[in-house]
Amino acid sequence: MNILAFESSCDETAVAVVRDGRQVLSDAILSQADMHALYGGVVPEIASRKHVQAIAALTDQVLTDAGLTKRDIDAVAVTYAPGLIGAVLVGVSFAKSAAYALGVPLIPVHHVRGHIAANYLAFPELEPPFVALAISGGNTLLVDVRDYADMTVLGATRDDAAGECFDKAARVLGLPYPGGKPMDELAQQSAGGKYELPRAHVAGAELDMSFSGLKTAVVNLAHNAQQKGEALDAPALARDFACAVSGELVPRAMRALELTGRTTLVAAGGVAANSVIRADLERACAKAGARLFLPPLRWCGDNGAMIGAQGYYEYLAGRTASLDLNAYATMDLGTLE
């Protein structure tokens, strides 16, 4: 089954063709990061307009790269939530038009479900059930994946997403947007241990997380040092910040394995590319005797192939949409439209 897939939830326009949920025939991504870096973050209106300009050409490109014609497409999948509403709407509108023109089913895909499914592209042996740690710029979740299209949220951030905090910390340290990779590179220059940063505890919800206090602490450290004319050890702060984020994520992920009785942990999302978090997950899973799947870096960020992968399994589960499908800025992972 050849699925033409679209992802436009933030600042990447991504289109792919995926066969049977596992084989990527072609994929293309147009990033707007350099443009949004001028503003220190994503400007929703600009993102939406750039999606409109790029999506048709990328669609032609992936079909050509895959050696397919439009008649070879069996279904269309698209991210319909969550994300920047204008950006998501561009992808949904184009996907609906494509499905109608081709006379094929339209498959709605939750963005975070797509991130989790990116691992299916890299690991043919991976099958549910497992626990997923989905960490990105807009979402931070622990998910019980009972089956390919049957998932429940076990824990989530109560405020900021982990990736959002990395971007904010990078900005106060004078690093470019997006901040995840520059922060990681800076952190490799220090062993850390210099700055004591707060760790949150959410009463009554042991798998929930909070990153707003950590973000505020880093901002205050940087501003106070500037006001006092003191030198800030940026590499040490970047390292200690990454360790603090990892300290929120990894113990909760391991606890989720205990509570569910699962023996496999899957990481997903852009923040899963962070070297400190990856190393901590590897150590924790080795100690617990759990299997760990870390996505290759190419599948950590937003891409169309992950939507095609999850779209296949949503289709097998009977989840298709009519042409009145809408776009949503927010949506729970387990209670889809």
Question: Predicted regions span which residues?
Answer:
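Conserved phosphate-binding/catalytic loops in two-lobed NTP-binding clefts
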Residues: 108-109, 282-307
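Glycine-rich phosphate-binding/hydrolytic loop that grips phosphoryl groups
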Residues: 295-333
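Conserved phosphate-binding catalytic cores of ATP/NTP-utilizing and phosphoryl-transfer enzymes
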Residues: 1, 109-131, 310
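Short Gly/Thr/Asp-enriched flexible loops that form oxyanion-binding sites at enzyme active sites
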Residues: 78-102, 275-283
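A contiguous, well-structured pocket-lining segment that forms one wall/lid of small-molecule binding clefts
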Residues: 185-265, 274-288, 315, 335
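Glycine-rich phosphate-binding loop plus the immediately following alpha-helix
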Residues: 124, 147-189, 215-216, 220-224
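N-terminal beta-alpha supersecondary unit
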Residues: 2-82, 111, 115
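Short beta-strand scaffold segments in enzyme catalytic cores
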Residues: 13-18, 132-134, 140-144
